[in-house]
Amino acid sequence: TLYEEYENKNMGMKTINARDVWFKILDSQSETGVPYLLYKDACNKKSNQKNLGTIKSSNLCCEIVEYSDDNETAVCNLASIALSKFVKTPSIPFKHLDNIKIYTKNNCNWCLMMKNELKKNNISYKEEKVEVEDFESFKKQHDVETVPQLYDGDDLIGGYSKVAELLKPVFDYDELHKITKIVTNNLNKVIDINFYPTVKTKTSNMRNRPIGIGVQGLADTFALMNIPFHSEQAAIVNKQIFETMYHAALEKSMEIAKIEGPYNSFNGSPASQGILQFDMWNEKVSNDRYDWDKLKDEIKENGIRNSLLLAPMPTASTSQILGNNECFEPFTSNIYVRRTIAGEFIIINKHLLQELINIGLWNEETKQQMVKY
């Protein structure tokens, strides 16, 4: 290799312990996310294209790892889905919508937050403020310790936490499944009608038919659902989102293959043997939400039209167009400068901003505190 050649010629400036370099790389990755490293053996072991030969590279952003050789140049056909669009308002759990009453008091942030929850769900209410001198008698009369308290007719529902839980937005997995199948179908059509700059790119795309479906706005989704990004609940929702997308993409690709046949290099691939991505990662997936065993049998019988399906890309520019946070990343900061090929923009966490406005806490002091920290 060139490295060994330079080493033999004593062209190096100095010698550094390899382990020290490795630890520096790991420190940098954990603190900054760079340098980008891919592990060749792991990439090939977990690829549905490993029957084609050894995969030697990825694209710049590392969301796709595809086979290339002297006769074909890998291409991928990408689209991202805005996850925030699948957050839906729950069905209203109250029985007496014409008789919702809340008890509040002055200088109570929890009271403001409860009113905000009701406002977001278009629920009208009557507010009664409890004066300081009446607070002890109020607690005894209603058998509560704090305000706010919400009544649905004559039924005590509870305080802010209870109401927030009842009105918590839900994620529409069925709609995501439907949209992912549409995107899969559309990207598959792009392969056939696309313009190819070289013969080798067309050869690769027609032979392997890879597509890459990614996401944007995962952080927005968690914000809309009032789920902390680092929480166990967020991990569950994240897993269910990608399980839904992977199942939908596989199912649609299989349905297309029933009509048009599997992609040319399907035979010998892991999918042709009923081995899917989670199998190559030694992950067990239950059939609670989707019947994976049935889908595997259908894929072995009919094939799939596309060798690759999901590819969570950075969405640095497209997420700005739709007003979402990038891909599956957490919010970088509540206020920051974003630079894209289109220019430089000041980005603010719009969900936090709206919450602060709704509860009356958006003011100059708050803004300066956000900028400071």
PLM feature spans:
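Long, C-terminal-biased catalytic regions of enzyme "large/alpha" subunits
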Residues: 1-97, 120, 168-373
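Thioredoxin-like thiol-disulfide oxidoreductase module
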Residues: 127-145, 163
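Local sequence-structure signature of Cys/Sec-based thiol-disulfide redox active-site neighborhoods
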Residues: 33, 96-128
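Short Cys/His-rich local motifs and their 1-3 flanking residues in nucleic-acid-associated proteins
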Residues: 83, 113-116, 155
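Non-catalytic, surface beta->alpha helical segment in thiol-disulfide oxidoreductase systems
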Residues: 152-169
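Alpha-helical elements of the RecA-like P-loop NTPase motor core of helicases
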Residues: 112, 116, 136, 165
